[in-house]
Amino acid sequence: MPSRLRKTRKLRGHVSHGHGRIGKHRKHPGGRGNAGGMHHHRINFDKYHPGYFGKVGMRHYHLKRNQSFCPTVNLDKLWTLVSEQTRVNAAKNKNGVAPIIDVVRSGYYKVLGKGKLPKQPVIVKAKFFSRRAEEKIKGVGGACVLVA
């Protein structure tokens, strides 16, 4: 239901007239807009708008990150990357197809030569092989396949 009087008429006789008792309807006591960000409004800008002032450095386009990232796995842990069932089946089929172990799928890039391999051929796929790892894999009749 619309009121009979306008808001102005209702507020007549009230000291503050809807403009509060602190600021008292004065113009722009803190400056207009973002004024004083480095001076009297410094605390607010530092807390709620960090990085608003100052310069930012240059962009490095086509930056190659993680060039040295190369997780490694040793030969003695190689068979833990596939299921036990795969290893048992490979041991039974002496003249069958050699199982393929893709170390990149397990999150490793390089195969190192620590430890011994069981005397059964295996095909290992990796991005890098150490010299000793390659010798040991080929020593049991396996093969090293380089993948990108």
From Swiss-Prot:
Q: Which residues, renumbered to this chain, carry the PTM Phosphoserine?
A: S68
| Residue numbers bearing the N6-acetyllysine modification | K47, K55, K110
Tell me what PTMs the record reports for this protein. Hydroxylated on His-39 by MINA.
Q: List the disulfide bonds in this chain.
A: none
* Compartment(s) of residence: Cytoplasm
Q: Name one GO molecular function term.
A: structural constituent of ribosome
Sequence positions bearing (3S)-3-hydroxyhistidine: H39
Write down the InterPro entries for this protein, in alphabetical order. Rbsml_uL15_N, Ribosomal_uL15, Ribosomal_uL15/eL18, Ribosomal_uL15/eL18_sf, Ribosomal_uL15_CS
Question: Which keywords, in A-to-Z order, does the entry hold?
Answer: Acetylation, Cytoplasm, Hydroxylation, Phosphoprotein, Ribonucleoprotein, Ribosomal protein
- Record field: compositional bias (Basic residues): 1-30
One GO CC term, this protein: cytosolic large ribosomal subunit
Complex and partners: Component of the large ribosomal subunit.
Q: What is this protein called?
A: Large ribosomal subunit protein uL15
Species for this entry: Rattus norvegicus
Which gene holds the coding sequence for this protein?
Rpl27a
